[in-house]
Amino acid sequence: MARKRKGRDISGWLVVDKPAGMTSTAVVNKVRWALGANKAGHAGTLDPEATGVLAIALGEATKTVPYITDALKAYVFTVRLGQATNTDDAEGEVIASSDLRPTDEQIKDALAPFLGDIMQVPPKFSAVKIDGQRAYKLARDGEDVELAARPLWVEELLMLDRPDPDHVLLEMTCGKGGYVRSIARDLGAALGCYGHVRELRRIWSGPFEAEDGITLEQVEALAKTPELDSYLRPLEEGLADLPELKCSPEGAQRLRNGNPGMVYPGEAEYGDEAWASFEGRAVAVGIYKSGELHPARVFARPE
C-alpha cells in the first residue's frame, strides 16, 4: 500500500522571485515546508545563479505544470564578451579569450539568425541526459560530452544596453527548452570573440511575472502562517493559454468521474485541448469533441 503524503492538501501557484545561489529544487523544498504542503513542483528550472520567476505548483496545480512549461518565457541577461567558459556562465573556468570587441551594430546584426525556429546545442554542463546520465555529471568527470542540437522557438531577441565594450545586455522571449547560456556562447562564436552569461534573470513565464513574485525572505518570514496562503494564485492561472469551457452540474460530475462531460459552446473547436470549469473552478483538462470534453486530467479538489 502506498504511503500517504504528509502535509496540507492545498492547491494553487506560488510565484517566487528566486534569489541567486540556490537550486530550483531547494526553493521548491523551502516553499513546501513553509506552506506545509503535501505536494509541490516547479514549472521550469532556473540555473542556481539565475534569478527571477520560479512558478511553484502545489497540490492539484501540479497537473497544470506542462502548460506553463510549454508557454513562452522571457529573460534579461548580460553576456560577457571576449571569454568562453566551460560552463558557458560566470561560474565556470575560462577556456578561451579574445581581444576582439564587436560594435553595437555588429551585435545587433548578429542577433537576427537567432530568431524564429533554430537548432540549439545545450551546454555541456546541463541536466540533459546522455545514456541515462546527466550531462553535467559526465562533464564534471572530465568526459568529452557531445550533445545533439535541439529545436527552439525564439520569438524575440533584443539588445537593451551596452554598458561597456566587454558586456551587452539582451532580452529574449522563447519557447520551451531554451538555454540562455547557449545563446551567449553561440553569439560570441558568431561575433568571433567568444561569450558567456554573466547574469541571468527570468522576468516572466507564461502568465507569471517576476515583479509579482514573493521573495524567499518573505516565504521564510511568513512560514506556517495564514499570511503566506494569501500569496497563493489560483490553480486556474496555469491554464491561461487554453480555452475555457463552462459545464453544467451534470457535466462536471461526469468529468470528475473521468467520463466525457457536456460543456457549453465557447472558443474551443473540435479536437482542441481545453479545460472545463464549473462555477469558476477548473474541473478537468481534455480534448473538446462534439459538445463534450474528453478528460485527460481531472482536478480532485474539495467542493
UniProtKB/Swiss-Prot annotation:
Name the Enzyme Commission number(s) assigned to this protein.
5.4.99.25
One of its GO biological process terms is: tRNA pseudouridine synthesis
One matching Pfam family, short form?
Answer: TruB_N
Q: Which UniProt keywords apply?
A: Isomerase, tRNA processing
Asked if the keyword Transport belongs to this entry, the reply reads no
Which superkingdom does the taxonomy of this entry point to? Bacteria
SUPFAM superfamilies, sorted: Pseudouridine synthase (SSF55120)
As its record notes, the protein acts as a catalyst of:
uridine(55) in tRNA = pseudouridine(55) in tRNA
CDD domains recorded: PseudoU_synth_EcTruB
Residues of the active site are: D47
Q: Which family does it belong to?
A: Belongs to the pseudouridine synthase TruB family. Type 1 subfamily.
Descriptive protein name: tRNA pseudouridine synthase B
